[in-house]
Amino acid sequence: MIQKLKDFKLTPENTYYATGKRKEAVARVWLLRDRPNTFIVGSDKTNKEYDLREYVQRETLYNKIMYPFKVTGHEGKFGIYATVRGGGISAQAEAIMYGVAKALLQHNPDLRPTLKKAGLLTRDAREKERKKYGQMGARAKYRWSKR
């Protein structure tokens, strides 16, 4: 049963908010203290809301999103509501993962060393390289002919 964000009473006492980014994907993540095991992803593009497993479809991406909970031992203690836009499904999953890690840090700042050691607080800054003029792409060149 999928619930809408408006169905949750979002107050500073029962939610933790953070933003995660990866490539072109941006995820706004709310951790819901009162609703454990509720995982909803809302796509800004389609204005639909999905169950997390239904949205990411691949088990590896689902495990990647849940990794911050596993590392800190907070499995089953929070629900996730996230809205994502931009990028592909893999980048969106990593953006949600990064947002979850930052939101857990808001919940308990003592988790910082654990999350840092797992590499969850370092944003992956790799972006697509821009196309250069006079070339086919970022690195690919047009075929050169001497005559």
From Swiss-Prot:
InterPro entries from the UniProt entry:
Ribosomal_Su5_D2-typ_SF, Ribosomal_uS9, Ribosomal_uS9_bac/plastid, Ribosomal_uS9_CS, Ribsml_uS5_D2-typ_fold_subgr
Q: Which protein, by its recorded name, is this? A: Small ribosomal subunit protein uS9
Which keywords does UniProt give here?
Ribonucleoprotein, Ribosomal protein
Q: Name one GO molecular function term.
A: RNA binding
**Which ranges form a coiled coil?**
none
Q: Which GO terms describe its cellular component?
A: cytosolic small ribosomal subunit
Q: Which domain of life is it from?
A: Bacteria
Record NCBIfam families: PRK00132.1
Gene source species = Aquifex aeolicus (strain VF5)
> Which residue ranges are recorded for the region named Disordered?
128-147
Per the record, the GO terms for biological process are: translation
- Can you tell me which family this protein belongs to? Belongs to the universal ribosomal protein uS9 family.
